[in-house]
């Protein structure tokens, strides 16, 4: 892609997100979301492949529907209250419509149908942007509106997302679909705790972005899009395969890695709010997600792809070296658990 065009696209992504962050008027916030959506479409379709075209079309139609619903909700709220301010969402119907629209935008269950198919049709770098940066603007709105949103609706969206995210990834062999269902499950944890502790939502979102960034970069270095294609990662780079193992376990939420921290704090907060049953369901759903993370770990570090003795030795391939961004993201993905007491005090 032309560097000038790429610079304009990346700048537009940043501009749209910043407009949503700083905007207090509903039309300004809506414009920021639309700029975000339109800016990523050229990145999605740059491959000129039928799968990329299909994924881009699905993404555009879904985001257009969510944007129309969001605009309708804001107009309804302004009509009933005479106020366009973002923080004056006092109409219960409008607040519910905003929640549904933003859930559709980020891919929460049961509005998740588009995310696995869209992510499967993209390359890994564009998929990384879709799975991380594109979540920031909708979550900025949700964090500002959390006192006015229906807690029961948020709880339903969160619990169903954790269950469907874990269940949907069990039978997948495509890495991008597995990461899509992983994203759905993590978003479920964030939405569940949003009404009770928005600080925990921000913590979970930050750790999710760091761990997802590490995972996508590793798969990009391995040049892998299927489970069976990462079996030779140990041959390409033993160090990177070990990093991938630890990062995937952190995504699964195993102690003593960083990914355990938000799950621990969220389950603790839900129990304090007398929500033991949803907390139990989410803890059990996390085991479903852990199962397909362990499948990836097994394929990455404990298996090798079939290799004929008549072929040249596969260990003579060019060695892969981790870059600075990957090493920093990996460190944050696996080493933050000792900070839990301090973070717990900050989230009170």
Curated annotation (Swiss-Prot):
It is found in: Mitochondrion inner membrane. This is NADH-ubiquinone oxidoreductase chain 2. It comes from Squalus acanthias (Spiny dogfish). One of its GO terms (biological process) is mitochondrial electron transport, NADH to ubiquinone. InterPro entries: Complex_I_Subunit_2, NADH_DH_su2_C, NADH_UbQ_OxRdtase_chain2, ND/Mrp_TM. Belongs to the complex I subunit 2 family. It is a multi-pass membrane protein. One of its GO terms (cellular component) is mitochondrial inner membrane. Core subunit of the mitochondrial membrane respiratory chain NADH dehydrogenase (Complex I) that is believed to belong to the minimal assembly required for catalysis. Complex I functions in the transfer of electrons from NADH to the respiratory chain. The immediate electron acceptor for the enzyme is believed to be ubiquinone.
């Amino acid at each position: 892609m032309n560097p000038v065009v790429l610079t304009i696209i990346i700048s537009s992504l940043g501009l749209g997100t910043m407009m949503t962050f700083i905007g207090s008027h509903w039309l300004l916030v809506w414009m920021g979301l639309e700029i975000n959506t339109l800016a990523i479409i050229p990145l999605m379709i740059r491959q000129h492949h039928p799968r990329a075209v299909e994924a881009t079309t699905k993404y555009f139609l879904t985001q257009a529907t969510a944007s129309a619903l969001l605009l309708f909700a804001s107009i309804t709220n302004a009509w009933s209250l005479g106020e366009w301010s973002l923080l004056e969402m006092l109409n219960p119907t409008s607040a519910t419509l905003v929640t549904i629209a933003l859930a559709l935008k980020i891919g929460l269950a049961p509005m998740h149908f588009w995310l696995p198919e869209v992510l499967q049709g993209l390359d890994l770098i564009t998929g990384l942007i879709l799975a991380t940066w594109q979540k920031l603007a909708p979550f900025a709105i949700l964090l500002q509106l959390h006192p006015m949103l229906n807690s029961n609706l948020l709880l339903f969206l969160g619990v169903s997302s954790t269950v469907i995210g874990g269940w949907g990834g069990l039978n997948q062999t495509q890495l991008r679909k597995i990461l899509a269902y992983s994203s759905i499950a993590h978003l479920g944890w964030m939405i569940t705790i949003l009404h009770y502790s928005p600080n925990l939502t921000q913590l979970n979102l930050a750790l999710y972005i760091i761990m997802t960034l590490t995972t996508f970069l590793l798969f990009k270095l391995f040049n892998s899009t299927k489970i069976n294609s990462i079996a030779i990662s140990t041959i390409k780079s033993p160090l990177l395969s070990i990093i991938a193992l630890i990062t995937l376990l952190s995504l699964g939420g195993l102690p003593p890695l960083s990914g355990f921290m938000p799950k621990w704090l969220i389950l603790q907060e839900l129990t304090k709010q007398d929500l033991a049953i949803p907390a139990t369901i989410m803890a059990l759903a996390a085991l479903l997600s852990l199962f397909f993370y362990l499948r990836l770990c097994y394929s990455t570090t404990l298996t090798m792809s079939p290799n004929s003795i008549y072929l040249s030795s596969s260990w003579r391939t060019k060695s892969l070296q981790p870059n600075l961004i990957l090493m920093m993201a990996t460190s944050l993905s696996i080493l933050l658990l000792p900070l839990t007491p301090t973070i717990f005090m900050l989230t009170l």
